[in-house]
């Protein structure tokens, strides 16, 4: 999990391979390569506060998904594993709740522990989402067919939460269902759930996707408590398909007209990913429009490569997102892009920030795998998986040196001349404040505080093999954003 390396950028993106010894964010499938070059960054004073440090016992290991916050200030999230045994993460993952105490600390409660692939799933990798009644919904690997599940957790009056599997994905034996749901879910106003699977959907003629290149799906609740799935769109890549992308890793997002927007990590003409739009039509089907196909070095200037995270919309209908690599910055450390909506329905892409690598301090971030959020002033906030070495070219995770830095939290502010100014709110440094923030986006409360998770780092705990390890943290960045008006 914690062996970190420099990424390499290649046109044939099938898996994200870390060549310095590192763990891949969220089991990504892309291949990115990055070189270390001098860069200059602007740093703001750190405002990070660690709310909870995972101990590697029964409280969870590797909080890969982000957190959501309820009206009482409780935080909810998932961990990929349960505990540390003989020096390695084991168990099938869990869903947790963090409750603030009068002392200002947070107390953890495990809401559900997954039992394994053929039971109720395993290894949740995304955040959860609330419905209006206070139930939680999420996705996990495994299930009866090994393609993943969608689950519901309902609170009971006496305290425990009850799990119900509302869908088992099955992309095998002629089924055109999706497989491997990695992103989080979203609700519409009618209580339907929407999400993506990174594989599946049929498409057996596709050159690169044995069981399909991924899907966008909908789950509709029935009166008897069951849910009915429908595939809104199945992605294709080659073999006579439309080459509209493959491997959607994150959730989709609605605009005010009910259209859905999302990204694919790979696929498209240059196999560097796409941004797509799905429009509902009266027949109940959805029509796909490709808004942008990433080309990176083929374009001048380069436009980025491999968007793992989804997009966020501003009030004008413009889209913003991140790419793992490319972008034309020194070393190609990734990019933040904007797709501007035109009067003719077309979108024009511009790169509003190019991440650059610094051999002397690694000050800028690299690999912005996480999604963005926008505050009421139009500022953008996100994370980078690596980078941010400050004046020290090395940070430590469990005694291992991470030469590029252990990740950053950044802010992009629009300026009067149409450009964007970058500042860094925090650089993860060592085994106290966490490291390697995961691809899920940050969460913002009404006061402008930001919340997120780092899959590694935190206080060192002695494991059963006698070594010392860290298992990740939940953090807060105080007062970073402009509160909603």
Model-derived features with residue positions:
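Extracellular beta-propeller repeat domains
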Residues: 2-485
């Amino acid at each position: 999990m914690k062996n970190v390396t420099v990424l390499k950028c290649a046109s044939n993106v099938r898996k994200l391979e870390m060549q310095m010894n590192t763990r891949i964010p969220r089991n990504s499938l892309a291949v990115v390569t990055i070189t270390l070059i001098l860069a200059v960054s602007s740093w703001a004073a750190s405002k990070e506060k660690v709310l909870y440090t995972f101990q590697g016992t029964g409280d969870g290991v590797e909080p890969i998904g982000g957190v959501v916050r309820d009206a009482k200030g409780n935080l909810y999230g998932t961990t990929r594993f349960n505990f540390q045994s003989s020096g390695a993460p084991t168990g099938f993952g869990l869903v947790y709740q963090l409750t603030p105490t009068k002392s200002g600390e947070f107390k953890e409660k495990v809401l559900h522990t997954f039992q394994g692939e053929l039971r109720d799933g395993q290894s949740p990798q995304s955040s959860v989402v609330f419905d209006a009644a206070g139930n939680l919904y999420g996705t996990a690997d495994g299930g009866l067919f090994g393609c993943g599940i969608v689950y519901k957790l309902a609170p009971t009056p006496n305290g425990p939460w009850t799990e119900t599997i509302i869908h088992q994905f099955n992309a095998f034996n002629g089924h055109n269902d999706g497989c491997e749901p990695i992103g989080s879910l979203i609700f519409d106003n009618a209580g339907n759930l929407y999400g993506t699977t990174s594989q599946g959907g049929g498409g057996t003629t596709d050159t690169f996707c044995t069981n399909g290149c991924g899907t966008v799906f909908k789950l509709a609740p029935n009166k008897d408590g069951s849910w009915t799935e429908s595939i809104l769109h199945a992605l294709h890549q080659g073999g006579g398909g439309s080459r509209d992308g493959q491997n959607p890793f994150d959730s989709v997002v609605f605009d005010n007209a009910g259209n859905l927007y999302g990204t694919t990590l790979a696929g498209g003409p240059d196999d560097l990913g796409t941004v797509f739009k799905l429009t509902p039509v009266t027949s109940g089907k959805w029509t796909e429009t490709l808004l942008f196909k990433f080309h990176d070095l083929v374009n001048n200037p380069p436009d980025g490569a491999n968007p793992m995270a989804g997009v966020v919309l501003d009030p004008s209908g413009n889209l913003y997102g991140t790419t793992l690599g490319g972008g034309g910055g020194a070393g190609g450390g990734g990019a933040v892009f904007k797709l501007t909506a035109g009067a003719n329905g077309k979108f024009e892409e511009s790169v509003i920030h190019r991440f650059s690598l610094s051999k002397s301090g690694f000050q800028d971030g690299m690999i912005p795998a996480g999604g963005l959020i926008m505050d009421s002033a139009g500022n953008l906030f996100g994370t980078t998986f690596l980078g941010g070495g400050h004046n020290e070219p090395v940070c430590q995770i469990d005694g291992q040196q991470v030469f590029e830095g252990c990740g950053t939290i950044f802010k992009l502010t629009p300026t009067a001349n149409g450009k964007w100014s970058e500042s860094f709110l925090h650089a993860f440094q060592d085994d106290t404040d966490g490291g390697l923030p995961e691809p899920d986006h940050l969460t913002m409360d009404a006061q402008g505080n930001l919340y997120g998770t780092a899959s590694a780092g935190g206080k060192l705990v002695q494991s059963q093999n006698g070594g010392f390890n860290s298992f990740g943290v939940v953090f807060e960045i105080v007062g970073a954003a402009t509160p909603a008006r």
